[in-house]
Amino acid sequence: CLYDVIGDAKIRPNQLFSMSLTYQVIDTNSEEAKNILNVVEKKLLNNYGLKTLAKGEENYVEIYEGDGYKRDTSYHQGITWPWLLGLYYDTLRNMIKSEKDKTSKKELQARLNEFVENTKKTFTKELYERGAIGSIAEIYDSKAPYLPKGTIAQGWSVAEIFRIIKEDLQK
């Protein structure tokens, strides 16, 4: 895994920036990249986004609740953010592009397809049945029932989910 700062080995989603951008910092065909993806999938990914901190890490918070101070300090301590799904999506696409082995490429494509289908299913329900009808919340609790919290209609959440769906429809 990559860490946010030297001396802090907490697992966070920021490591995906190194592989999700147009010009990746890490070779997306490397073992390091595959390890990062596996850790993110196992420890941070859920249907509503990526947790900002892995469960079990010091200061982990999975429910966004309490007074203003408690809520503000929990934002980046495990709460789920939908917009971070865009980093995961772009990382998978970059890994597929750079993968030379046909079997591995097929497996990555299957993971991407499953992810996109889950994203469509999850957020179609959100758009029509929960929270602010027609929108997506800023954040979600990181445990079932994954309640929408924070800003009830967040532009960057909507934008990333719509981008994932739109790009999938255009392929």
Q: Can you say where each PLM-predicted feature lies in the sequence?
A:
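Catalytic cores of carbohydrate-active enzymes
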Residues: 1-63, 118-158, 165
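Structural helix-adjacent loops and short alpha-helical linkers that scaffold large soluble proteins
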Residues: 22-38, 92-117, 169-171
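Broad hydrophobic/π-residue packing in well-ordered secondary structure
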Residues: 1-2, 21, 74-75, 81, ...
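Generic alpha-helix detector with strongest preference for long hydrophobic helices that associate
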Residues: 69-73, 100, 104, 108, ...
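Short amphipathic alpha-helical interaction segments
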Residues: 76-80, 104-115, 128, 149, ...
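Feature representing long, continuous alpha-helical segments
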Residues: 38, 79, 83-90, 110, ...
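C-terminal substrate/ligand-recognition segments
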Residues: 61-100, 162-166
